[in-house]
Amino acid sequence: MLLLLGLCLGLSLCVGSQEEAQSWGHSSEQDGLRVPRQVRLLQRLKTKPLMTEFSVKSTIISRYAFTTVSCRMLNRASEDQDIEFQMQIPAAAFITNFTMLIGDKVYQGEITEREKKSGDRVKEKRNKTTEENGEKGTEIFRASAVIPSKDKAAFFLSYEELLQRRLGKYEHSISVRPQQLSGRLSVDVNILESAGIASLEVLPLHNSRQRGSGRGEDDSGPPPSTVINQNETFANIIFKPTVVQQARIAQNGILGDFIIRYDVNREQSIGDIQVLNGYFVHYFAPKDLPPLPKNVVFVLDSSASMVGTKLRQTKDALFTILHDLRPQDRFSIIGFSNRIKVWKDHLISVTPDSIRDGKVYIHHMSPTGGTDINGALQRAIRLLNKYVAHSGIGDRSVSLIVFLTDGKPTVGETHTLKILNNTREAARGQVCIFTIGIGNDVDFRLLEKLSLENCGLTRRVHEEEDAGSQLIGFYDEIRTPLLSDIRIDYPPSSVVQATKTLFPNYFNGSEIIIAGKLVDRKLDHLHVEVTASNSKKFIILKTDVPVRPQKAGKDVTGSPRPGGDGEGDTNHIERLWSYLTTKELLSSWLQSDDEPEKERLRQRAQALAVSYRFLTPFTSMKLRGPVPRMDGLEEAHGMSAAMGPEPVVQSVRGAGTQPGPLLKKPYQPRIKISKTSVDGDPHFVVDFPLSRLTVCFNIDGQPGDILRLVSDHRDSGVTVNGELIGAPAPPNGHKKQRTYLRTITILINKPERSYLEITPSRVILDGGDRLVLPCNQSVVVGSWGLEVSVSANANVTVTIQGSIAFVILIHLYKKPAPFQRHHLGFYIANSEGLSSNCHGLLGQFLNQDARLTEDPAGPSQNLTHPLLLQVGEGPEAVLTVKGHQVPVVWKQRKIYNGEEQIDCWFARNNAAKLIDGEYKDYLAFHPFDTGMTLGQGMSREL
């Protein structure tokens, strides 16, 4: 969708000034002394606004991507100037937020229902020209405004998309085209896949129109300055080129697309099912199946407009494709202009001779005449139907048409609705049509509807692109059908509002995705049935997938929760469901010719899009403003409506898996994993990755106690304290009272002194200027190496100097019980920057190791692998840590908002012998107390 945001903020005519000419520096003046006066006047160029920052942050959680673009500009001129922000976004993405800061005014985007009459500042325009429509598979978002003299402006754009699997890989593409060199340019991508990341690659920068089929390309490595940190389930990719590196790539600031490709591990044939807060998503991508035979007719436009390069490239591509056909396949070729020319009047078996003859036929095709799209499609469908009718019921195969044209129907039937109706009636759902449109004159809407209505896909090839390589790449996606007539069923008593569950074909390297709502959140199992046909037989897969809380993963996406009926924290699976449902409603609306039905679909799609803040053809964006800015916001660096911080989600695949999607620096053996945490009542978890052990303990404190969690004030300058709040114990519980973390305070002493106070409702940042951030709004602020990312009602991520990161979970209750309190959880996501002298209830273990020994009373089995133990009373053992012998017992503990279950060795009695000193030694006098404690003193003696 192409958006042109023309903000009527007082347009003015901008002319050059003496001050602008001087901004080019003394060297320009010295050069001017050597040239005549009239030439020197021409050199006094107008100073355009300077882009001081261009940054993109993207988080992919189980294929669902949240992306936020931040752009800051400065008007160095002495007069007001027009500025424009533009960003290419994937065509499949939905814009969810746009915010603009002009001087001291904030303009906040709001998604509303589209009205026929619009007097708003936001104007939308769709232009099908190559210049306006961006690169292949993208659309351009534009916003323009006037920036006052010597003032600043900032733009923040957020969008979401579900990554599609093609050729065995998910591809995430980010446009890096700031239009000028920027002193602060960065792309930061986090990938979290609980199934495990099987492969990951970063491609060289591309301009999309230069990209081809993907065969044998992209082997020159990632762009310069790219850093990749990866472990089993998490990857962080950072692209941060200097100005010099940017200039070497493109001096005009149009660097190209930053592309990441990856795939995930797959275990069960039934697929990967993830559940969260009453929503589920089912990823189905079976492998190791024999390919289905395919019956394919290649329909090639040979009208006069195809003369020259387009026809030559297409012929070369078909030569390659014919050699890829399998012996069990059957094929034919049709060329069409104002006449329909069929190579053979029946489908031909694949043999060396038939491939040779087909290539000869293609070679002799010559461009002439008009374009009879209807006649060509009818002839191709008749060929396929004739073969299927005579092949017998035992012949399981897939019938496909690959249709390529560069124009509109000009001969025969030219009425679009008639062509669509004729094709639909002839195909009868038995033939899938895959269309490719070349150039600017093609009727792409017709091709799109032909594919949508006939179980196919469509691709657009721009005029400057290599049509042949695009055809090969498109064919590669459909060259290997593995299943047909796929149906995935769930019990109606368990699942409602599921997305599409019927699929005509499944091609190797792709993926089927279904999402829906669970009727009962406490459901023990989700029954799944998959029926399909492959080359040999009819397949039925049935299984009950456990969805118990201890088997499910808890996610903290940080994306706003604008709708839905779930409780608790934000849910990326819910947003994935809303994304898929909206897409399917839009597709159904596009296919429908019945006006009442179209209106019903439009209303449903519109209501859902407004609820989840998706910008669609049925919604519009209005900028509300100006509104007051929060104190100190103007100087905050990196502010954005970021969606998707560091979450954790676990797949439901019939067996529990260990969470661990945390940052790992390459070539460094020590890993700081975010299981190291304090959460709940309060429950402490310490991970020892080198020993493959997790240890847990409780601290039974008193309301008002301030616990020192991390103490590294002297070295890294970081101190973290947590204040407890009391609550009554649940009925029939063994405790007299509960305590939770009410407030987390963080003191950073280097390089500049900053104070952070975090509660479930707000974040206070005091680093000279006091800044108050509400926790119900997503925002990112930063300065002096400190970044604070608030994800609405979900979590707060604090990053210090890029080497220390804490994630504070926000636990809110819609209707809290008497024993429940809004509270916080504290997780150490990255401890690389903390020193070896770090102490505190959690900090003292960050640089320690531990080992397990047998209990003196008798041997224990599988002590380092408690997952292998039988469920029941946990065995006891002795833990050796920091020279102490600590009795422990195996337990299971819930973390990440109480939904994910881990196995750990539990130390009783307020962690006696496990921690240095005793519990009272870790009590601080006030929230920002950094004074030396007994524990800290002992830590320096160890």
Swiss-Prot record:
CC per GO annotation: collagen-containing extracellular matrix; extracellular region
Top-level taxonomy: Eukaryota, Metazoa, Chordata, Craniata, Vertebrata
Induction per the UniProt record: Down-regulated in breast tumors.
InterPro entries xrefs: ITI_HC_C (IPR010600), ITIH (IPR050934), VIT (IPR013694), VWF_A (IPR002035), vWFA_dom_sf (IPR036465)
Domain of life: Eukaryota
Residue span, VWFA domain: 295-478
Residue ranges occupied by any VIT domain in the UniProt entry: 35-161
Protein name per the record: Inter-alpha-trypsin inhibitor heavy chain H5
Functional description taken from the UniProt entry: May act as a tumor suppressor.
Family the entry assigns: Belongs to the ITIH family.
Molecular function (Gene Ontology), one example: serine-type endopeptidase inhibitor activity
Stretches for region Disordered: 116-136, 208-227, 550-571
Sugar attachment sites: 97, 127, 231, 421, 508, 776, 795, 862
SMART domains reported in the protein's UniProt record: VIT, VWA
Protein encoded by which gene: ITIH5
Compartmental location: Secreted
Keywords assigned: Glycoprotein, Protease inhibitor, Secreted, Serine protease inhibitor, Signal
Signal sequence bounds: 1-16
Tissue-by-tissue expression: Abundantly expressed in placenta. Less abundant expression in mammary gland and ovary. Expression is barely detectable levels in all other tissues tested.
GO BP annotation list: hyaluronan metabolic process
